[in-house]
């Protein structure tokens, strides 16, 4: 303790006696490496700065499996990382404010690609390639998570099914402006 503030290694406990935080402190704040446990059973192991998750870290589901591994900025998932959904599908790419944002690749739980391209606020956006579980795929433009704009829908063998304009996830025979 320095001036009444924790410095060095230490542990903070919940009222019930379970550990809230175990790790490094500087001037009473989480700083350096540590583990923070949350009341819902999830926990974080990684770097802290000024009391916030900041730097490299790993978030875990309450069953102990990995939820997210990558960069944090001021307590938010931001930068590059890997997010694993409860259904086993996962995303590797860029994040902003806790959401998939920028370039990235989404995978089915079996490791095959579900989507590759641009994302904005967790939604497919601009240009990308979406591959369906039956092997068919779409290459083209997206808007708010939907096929929208110019694009081509292929079957699993590469034969064109629809080519042209798409609107709100459907092939459109009408011209889109």
List PLM regions with ranges:
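Conserved anchor residues at repeat-unit boundaries in beta-strand-based tandem repeats, strongest
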Residues: 1-7, 20-32, 43-54, 67-78, ...
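Terminal, low-structured helical/coil segments at or just beyond the last alpha-helical repeat
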Residues: 172-176
């Amino acid at each position: 303790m320095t001036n009444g503030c924790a410095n060095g290694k230490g542990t903070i406990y919940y009222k019930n006696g379970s550990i809230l935080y175990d790790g490094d402190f500087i001037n009473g704040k989480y700083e350096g490496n540590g583990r923070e446990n949350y009341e819902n059973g999830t926990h974080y192991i990684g770097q802290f700065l000024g009391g916030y998750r900041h730097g490299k870290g790993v978030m875990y589901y309450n069953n102990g499996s990995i939820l997210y591994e990558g960069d944090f900025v001021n307590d938010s998932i931001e930068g590059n990382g890997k997010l694993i959904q409860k259904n086993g599908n996962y995303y590797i790419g860029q994040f902003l404010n806790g959401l998939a944002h920028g370039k990235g690749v989404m995978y089915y739980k079996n490791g095959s690609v579900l989507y590759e391209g641009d994302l904005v606020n967790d939604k497919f956006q601009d240009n990308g390639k979406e591959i369906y579980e039956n092997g068919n795929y779409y290459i083209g433009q997206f808007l708010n998570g939907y096929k929208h704009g110019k694009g081509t829908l292929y079957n699993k063998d590469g034969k064109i099914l629809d080519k042209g304009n798409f609107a709100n996830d459907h092939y459109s025979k009408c011209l889109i402006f």
